[in-house]
Amino acid sequence: MEIIKLREEFIKLGQALKAEGLVESGVEAKEVIQDGFVKVNGEVDTRRGKKLYDGDIVFFDGTEIKIEK
C-alpha cells in the first residue's frame, strides 16, 4: 500500500494518481477516472476533482493508496 501525506486539507483524485506516478499526465488521469478504472473507498468514482481526505483509500491498476494527514 502506498501512502500520500496530505499537505493541505485534501488532495484531488487526479492529483493523487499523478503524485504516485500511476499516470503520466492530467489527461491520462481524467481518462482512467472517467472510464471507471479507479475506486475510492471501494466504489468506482468518475470525478477527477473528487476531494480525498485523511483515511480515504484509492485503488487503481493493482495499487492501493491510503490518504493520511
Residue ranges with predicted function:
Residues V44, G62-I67:
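Short, charged beta-turn/beta-strand-edge "cap" motif at the junction between a beta-strand
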Residues V23-S25, V58-D61:
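Short, low-complexity, polar/charged sequence segments that are solvent-exposed and flexible
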Residues M1-I11:
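A detector for short, charged/polar N-terminal pre-domain segments
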Residues E9-K51:
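A basic, amphipathic helix-loop patch mediating RNA/tRNA/ribosome contacts
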